Amino acid sequence: INAETIKLRSLISEAHAASNGSAGARTIADIVTNQGVKLSRYRATKLMRTLGLVSCQEPKHRYRKASQEHIDVPNHLSRQFAVTAPNEVWAGDVTYIWTGNRWMYLAVVIDLFARKVIGWSMSLSPDSRLTGKALSMAYESRGKPKGVMFHSDQGSHYTSRKYRQLLWRFQIKQSLSRRGNCWDNAPIERFFRSLKTEWVPTVGYRSFAEAQQEITRYIIGYYCQLRPHQYNGGLTPNESERLYWENSKTVANFS
């Protein structure tokens, strides 16, 4: 075995371990290539087979909920998920995860530019306090931007007076999916599918505290920082945003 193969085996093993054993050959190839070592999907498949590594993803499971309060807010986004800059359009949703002896609810906010998770919150109740905390985290972490559009489904935790007041305070424009149509918020659905197939154990977590720790680790350490995203051309959300701001600075200096 030559030195190059030994190095590739090591990088593949590290990437597989970092993904909690969920990454397949394509994801492994993108991760290693993003680290500066070129690796094709075909070769990754062969080396993973040699190392006895397989992707241990579970079937997807999706959570939908009904609205308890109807308000007249149009679908401003209309499935236009490709945006041109960060902080133009954010999207949010809620899912549930088993934690020992009851369900825990996870609310997330994603910036659609690079599919980066910018806000999240976990609670034992799927209410507007949960979704409000996720939105507040996003708003603070992004430097309190103006002119953002926020898109979600028609769940009561997004249509409540309390949540709409928070949007008004942050000067964020609200957009709601059509009732019962999950494709109107497809990027969030894909994130939840990735989380549950790549990271969350089949039987859930042993406790609320363990779930908080592991899901935060997935979002910060793996999904945003290490996991390549097809929408970003194989780049991670963090790298895609970094390149945008770097290019924006270059254009500004040139101008």
Which residues fall in each region the model found?
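Active-site beta-loop-alpha junctions of metal-dependent nucleic acid enzymes
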Residues: 102, 121-143, 149, 159
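An active-site-proximal beta-strand-loop segment
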Residues: 79, 83-118, 124-126
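Mobile genetic element proteins and their domesticated derivatives, centered on retroelements
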Residues: 12, 28, 44, 48, ...
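C-terminal domain-tail junction helix/linker
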Residues: 168-172, 194-255
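Basic, flexible linker segments flanking DNA-binding modules
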Residues: 1-85, 181, 236-248
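RNase H-like polynucleotidyl transferase catalytic core
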Residues: 57-62, 122, 150-154, 168-187, ...
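Short amphipathic alpha-helical interaction patches enriched in hydrophobic/aromatic residues
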Residues: 16, 32, 36, 121, ...
